[in-house]
Structures are given as structure tokens and as C-alpha cells.
């Protein structure tokens, strides 16, 4: 499968010393880069810092030894670079001309790289985001009719695997990804004291999918303090597991304020965390799964296309709601999601009274593709 970022990535290799590809665990970042190298006959060396033994040996090296190693090939691929102890010092020397090779970095968790360098990479277009293949990318690989028939599978198993992957293989792979997320060796600035609390946080959010929650509510359910929950959720967002939608409010009457909805950036991860791979006919959370999948796909579409946007939800104390609000340079638009296209959705009159200039659209199984790919 040719990923959406392929052409832009290949174009940067001859001119950039450092390229960073970030994205969720097991999303194919290293495989993508290795595929690019292979297809373009580029010599490279790969260091898999996600492997504990390799990480231990590499982190024993001095900076001088690390620089020597980097110069043994035209290109160096540092997988899960967040685990490299001397990462910032190494990159400083790369930029100072001490390394002839180009350095390709992958990261599933936030690496300890100075903000100025991260901003420079983003400005130069050298920081790519690579999630599991999006629905759009799958349709390019197969066809829209084929992928549309598999929507139910996407709601259950997410986008990590193609439609023809066996269900048991999907479940096993997703469970392993959850284990990898919970047991991740995060950087010192993103410490996790108790992995069981991290897993419990994920499970609570999974069980309240699509529901407004405050940090205090989550902390009360789990039995820990607010600061811990806020920090753990921040790490999960930075690690591409969650996306936080804050409530939209301009202090109008009856509006819900200071709460969040947490979106899982892959439905399969959400369902694996609570071990629920039941078919849709056996579920009570179909609309929540539909909403989560659509919002996650929309956010990923914008990110891989470098579209800057902000996202919100809206609720009132009188139970009126807009599931998703997108704000970009073209303006603001609201959306309500319903899996069953035969059931009409009413637009919330309170929202329309407060914000008559923000249109509200309905997205169902008959109208979703234009929403996912809207530019």
C-alpha cells in the first residue's frame, strides 16, 4: 500500500539530515521507511530501540561511538528514538556536520527533543504523522465499494489490519498493542508510575466513549488524584492513543463547560482495552463506535494532509448536543453522527439560536465518505 505521505517523504531524503515520523505503536512507521529505502535502492542501517537488549547496548555507547556508528552507512534508521539516552546530543552533532548520513527517526511516544528542533522539523515539512492506514488509503488500495462493505469491521477492529485479516489474528494483534502501550518505557519527562493505573484509565475512557467527562470524574472512578489522571491522559494523547475534544462554549446559557470527550484514534484499541469484539448486532454502543471512528478518521485525514484545525464538541444541560465541531481557516462546521441512515436527526435548536452562523450536518452510513475526505 502506498501511504499518503510517500511522495513528500521521498522528496525530502536527498536534502534533509533529520526526518521524524511519529505515530501510534505498531502503525507501520519503520516498515514504511524501510520500504522507501528498498524501493529507491538506498543503503541504510536500522537500530531497533524498541528491543530491550538492543536499547541497553546502544545506550552504553558514548556520543563519539554513536557518531562513528552513524557514519557507517548513508542512512540511519532509529526506530522508537524516544529510547535513545543521548538523542538530543546526537542530533545536535548531526546538525553540526559530524555525521554524513541522513537520520530517520520514528517515535510512538514523545521523544526528548528540544522544542526548537521539533518546530524546525515541522516548519520544513520533515515531521510526518503516520497512523494505521486511513479509510481513504484502504479505498485506494482496494476500492470504495469493498471498504464500504467492511465498515462494520472497522468499527470493531479499527484500521490496523486489512479486511481480509482473520478475526483471531486481529484480536491477538490489538491485544498485543494494548500491552505495548501500557508497558511502554516512556521518557523521563513522561513517567508512568503504575501501569495498572494507566490501563484502568484507558478502560474507563473506553467504557465512557462519547460521553463528556471531567478529570475529577475519571479520578474518582479510578481512585487516584486529579493530577495523576491529567498527566496520564496527556501522555496517552501525546502517544497517539487518544484525542481530547474540549467542550465548545462562549458562556451562553445552559452550555456545558470545562468537560471533555476522549476519542480513541483507533476503534480496535478501544475495543481491545475492554475485551469487547462482539459483532454490531450484539452491541449497545454502535452509535458511540460510529462517532469515534468518524472523528478519529477525520482528525487523521487532516493531520496527514497538513490541515491545521481545532476540534470541539457541544452539549447543553438540556441534553441537546453537537457531536463534533471542526474549526479551520474556512470557518466552523458542526456534525451529528448516526449509524442508521433511516433515523433522522434533529438539529439542536439551542445551538442554532446561539450560533446561527455555524452549520450543522448529519453524517450517517450514506454520507460519511464526503465527510472523511472534505478539504
Identify the residue ranges that each predicted region occupies.
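Catalytic P-loop NTPase motifs of RecA-like helicase/translocase cores
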Residues: 53, 82-86, 112-113
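Interdomain hinge/linker elements that couple catalytic modules in large macromolecular machines
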Residues: 129-272, 278, 282, 288-291, ...
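Structural recognition of the conserved hydrophobic beta-strand(s) that form the central parallel beta-sheet
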Residues: 77-78, 102-109
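Short glycine-rich substrate-engagement loop in P-loop NTPases that contacts/grips substrate
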Residues: 45-72
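Conserved P-loop NTPase "ATPase switch" module shared by AAA+ and STAND
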Residues: 69-87
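Short regulatory helix/loop adjacent to the ATP-binding pocket of P-loop NTPases
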Residues: 111-125
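Conserved Walker B catalytic segment
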Residues: 82-104
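A cross-kingdom feature that marks ATP-driven nucleic-acid transaction machinery
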Residues: 2-6, 13, 17-30, 35-42, ...
Amino acid at each position: 500500500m502506498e501511504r499518503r505521505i510517500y511522495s513528500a517523504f521521498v522528496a525530502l531524503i536527498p536534502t534533509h539530515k533529520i526526518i521524524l515520523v511519529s505515530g501510534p505503536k505498531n502503525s507501520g512507521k519503520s516498515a514504511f521507511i524501510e520500504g522507501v529505502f528498498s524501493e529507491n535502492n538506498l543503503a541504510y542501517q536500522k537500530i531497533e530501540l524498541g528491543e530491550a537488549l538492543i536499547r541497553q547496548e546502544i545506550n552504553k555507547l558514548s556520543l563519539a561511538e554513536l557518531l562513528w556508528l552513524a557514519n557507517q552507512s548513508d542512512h540511519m534508521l532509529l526506530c522508537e528514538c524516544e529510547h535513545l539516552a543521548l538523542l538530543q546530543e546526537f542530533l545536535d552533532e548531526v546538525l553540526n556536520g559530524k555525521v554524513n548520513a541522513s537520520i530517520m527517526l520514528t517515535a510512538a511516544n514523545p521523544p526528548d527533543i528540544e522544542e526548537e528542533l521539533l518546530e524546525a522539523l515541522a516548519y520544513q515539512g520533515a515531521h510526518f504523522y503516520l497512523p494505521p492506514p486511513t479509510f481513504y488509503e484502504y479505498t485506494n488500495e482496494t476500492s470504495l465499494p469493498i471498504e464500504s462493505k467492511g465498515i462494520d469491521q472497522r468499527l470493531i477492529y479499527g484500521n490496523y489490519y486489512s479486511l481480509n485479516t482473520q478475526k483471531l489474528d486481529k484480536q491477538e494483534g490489538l491485544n498485543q498493542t494494548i500491552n505495548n502501550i501500557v508497558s511502554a518505557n516512556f521518557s523521563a519527562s513522561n513517567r508512568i508510575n503504575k501501569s495498572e493505573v494507566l490501563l484502568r484509565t484507558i478502560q474507563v475512557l473506553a467504557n465512557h466513549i462519547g460521553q463528556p467527562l471531567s478529570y475529577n470524574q475519571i479520578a474518582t472512578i479510578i481512585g487516584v488524584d486529579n493530577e495523576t489522571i491529567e498527566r496520564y491522559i496527556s501522555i496517552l494523547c501525546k502517544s497517539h492513543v487518544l484525542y481530547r475534544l474540549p467542550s465548545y462554549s462562549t458562556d451562553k446559557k445552559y452550555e456545558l463547560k470545562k468537560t471533555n470527550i476522549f476519542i480513541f484514534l483507533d476503534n480496535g484499541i478501544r475495543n481491545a482495552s475492554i475485551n469487547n469484539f462482539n459483532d454490531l448486532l450484539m452491541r449497545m454502543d454502535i452509535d458511540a463506535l460510529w462517532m469515534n471512528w468518524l472523528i478519529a478518521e477525520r482528525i487523521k485525514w487532516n493531520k496527514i494532509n497538513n490541515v491545521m484545525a481545532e476540534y470541539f464538541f457541544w452539549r447543553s444541560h438540556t441534553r441537546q448536543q453537537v457531536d463534533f465541531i471542526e474549526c479551520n481557516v474556512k470557518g466552523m462546521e458542526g456534525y451529528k453522527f448516526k449509524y442508521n441512515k433511516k433515523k433522522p436527526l434533529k438539529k439542536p435548536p439551542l445551538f442554532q439560536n446561539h450560533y446561527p452562523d455555524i452549520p450543522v450536518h448529519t453524517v450517517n452510513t450514506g454520507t460519511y465518505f464526503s465527510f472523511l475526505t472534505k478539504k
